[in-house]
Amino acid sequence: MNMFSSLMLASLSVLTLPIMSSILNTHKNSTYPHHVKNIISYAFITSLIPTMMFIHSGQETIISNWHWMTIQTLKLSLSFKLDYFSMIFVPVALFVTWSIMEFSLWYMHSDPYITRFFKYLLTFLITMMILVTANNLFQLFIGWEGVGIMSFLLIGWWYGRTDANTAALQAILYNRIGDIGFIMAMAWFLFNTNTWDLQQIFMLDPNLTNLPLLGLLLAATGKSAQFGLHPWLPSAMEGPTPVSALLHSSTMVVAGVFLLIRFHPLMENNKTIQSLTLCLGAITTLFTAICALTQNDIKKIIAFSTSSQLGLMIVTIGINQPYLAFLHICTHAFFKAMLFMCSGSIIHSLNDEQDIRKTGGLFNAMPFTTTSLIIGSLALTGMPFLTGFYSKDLIIETANTSYTNAWALLMTLIATSLTAVYSTRIIFFALLGQPRFLPLTTINENNPFLINSIKRLLIGSIFAGFFISNNIYPTTIPEMTMPIYMKLTALTVTILGFTLALELSLITHNLKLEHPTNMFKFSNLLGYYPTIMHRLPPLANLSMSQKSASLLLDSIWLENILPKSISQFQMKTSILISTQKGQIKLYFLSFLITLTLSMLLFNLHE
């Protein structure tokens, strides 16, 4: 094992130290959260060395040390894949987690179970690292389920609240639907290729049937909150803000996209799956952007923007650009985590007020938080030379020069424009104008944990895109020539979005709508999707179950067997008897018919 892989394993295994220490030393320790935060910072610094070595040499490594078990001809072993995707993602995830852990020291300082909270976050990080570095489906599935169960525990952290419990249950149920697809794909690979190792699967048959790939797409739909299985992500905002910043913006929700990137060698020549992926991503990115326009909860707006960006990543995979989707995963993590932390800072300072209509004028009261929020929003919209620009602008350019589904690409452009609209709406409502919160609210953002954590991500939101895109060579040949109007498309639609948002804000200030329009209702009620899916099927199920339980037993078994069947039998026999008229000619006729039929049959038989 060379130095490169040793250092990478050291940076990952150091994360398990706080878990081990908590098992050995069970009594409460007030310094434990600080200990966890420091360990993650050390892991991040250590992971930078192998990443730099990888960027310099470009040498991928597979570590396969521990053989676990053999089932007939299937060999299961612990295998780590240190390639382009895992080597770049690990430092990004560790950096973001380090900042969020420090933010949690401020945000959760009054929580009596802060030690357990940090343990949960650390366990989540370990399972995420298992998922990213896995070289076989079995190991990947362990990480996949691990992040799912940690998401459930962390969303329902404040278990005294009904909403938190409902949201946690909703998240796990929607993810279960996705997991069915994952398990189906695993079973297919086991029966047809007799292996779960990624290299062997890719080598054996690149032209698979659509079934396992559809299973993987369903798994990605569940985990990455794509249209159809998307309602759990906005509901997950019931959890604490650090959970939203870490799990539901930058790391866990991109696991579905990461899965599709991992299996891209099987998808790149499959037109059906590519088209399905593209259309699914386009519908998601537009639908969730529309839903974000009229929400009033600051965290829900950012959650819908996350879902919209995930849709954009899926679109990028759909136009056969997995490396570009991965670049967007890495750049998106910085500013989206920072946006959540800024919203958490505002919520905490305003005594847990999340409604943007009850904020306002915070630019003077919270200069650092609001500046970071504005820069994060600009990075999200793809402002030139901020982090988001380096991936988002490339995605729009590649989409414009792609010859695939034009409708899907048009929907993506509209969604990009709407990104600017809801980002500007947050800035207008929360930061500008007159203060609309209680005058006795004491606002204080002068805490080193808060300032340092946001500051690090702020630097990342400005410079990370430049560094990542400069140090990583392009893997596909870029377009050599492009008309100037196509080059400026992304910037144009963003500016259009800003203009539209300014116009809307002026209308909102000067005009009161007595009756909301149908479009407003559609957006505000999330496209009626939760109303339909969470009300009608359960109602039909419950009423059918009640009827089958209460009526089936009584009506069929008890009534039909004895009382009803006896009466039916008596009625039929009485009808039969009463129709007999007692005339001899009728009896003779019946004899004659029988005789004729028997003679005919006898003749035919001969």
From Swiss-Prot:
GO MF term set: NADH dehydrogenase (ubiquinone) activity
GO CC terms: mitochondrial inner membrane
The protein's Enzyme Commission number: 7.1.1.2
Pfam families per UniProt: NADH5_C, Proton_antipo_M, Proton_antipo_N
Keyword terms, alphabetized: Electron transport, Membrane, Mitochondrion, Mitochondrion inner membrane, NAD, Respiratory chain, Translocase, Transmembrane, Transmembrane helix, Transport, Ubiquinone
Subcellular localization(s) per the UniProt record: Mitochondrion inner membrane
Main localisation: mitochondrion
Gene Ontology process terms (BP): electron transport coupled proton transport; mitochondrial electron transport, NADH to ubiquinone; mitochondrial respiratory chain complex I assembly
Membrane topology: Multi-pass membrane protein
Transmembrane segment boundaries: 4-24, 38-58, 87-107, 117-137, 140-160, 171-191, 211-233, 241-261, 273-293, 301-320, 325-347, 366-386, 413-433, 457-477, 488-508, 584-604
Recorded catalytic activity of this chain's protein: a ubiquinone + NADH + 5 H(+)(in) = a ubiquinol + NAD(+) + 4 H(+)(out)
InterPro entries attached to this UniProt entry: NADH_DH_su5_C (IPR010934), NADHpl_OxRdtase_5_subgr (IPR018393), ND/Mrp_TM (IPR001750), NU5C-like (IPR003945), Proton_antipo_N (IPR001516)
Subunit text: Core subunit of respiratory chain NADH dehydrogenase (Complex I) which is composed of 45 different subunits.
Family per similarity comment: Belongs to the complex I subunit 5 family.
Functional summary from the UniProt entry: Core subunit of the mitochondrial membrane respiratory chain NADH dehydrogenase (Complex I) which catalyzes electron transfer from NADH through the respiratory chain, using ubiquinone as an electron acceptor. Essential for the catalytic activity and assembly of complex I.
Name this protein carries in UniProt: NADH-ubiquinone oxidoreductase chain 5
Species whose genome carries this gene: Equus asinus
Higher taxonomy: Eukaryota, Metazoa, Chordata, Craniata, Vertebrata
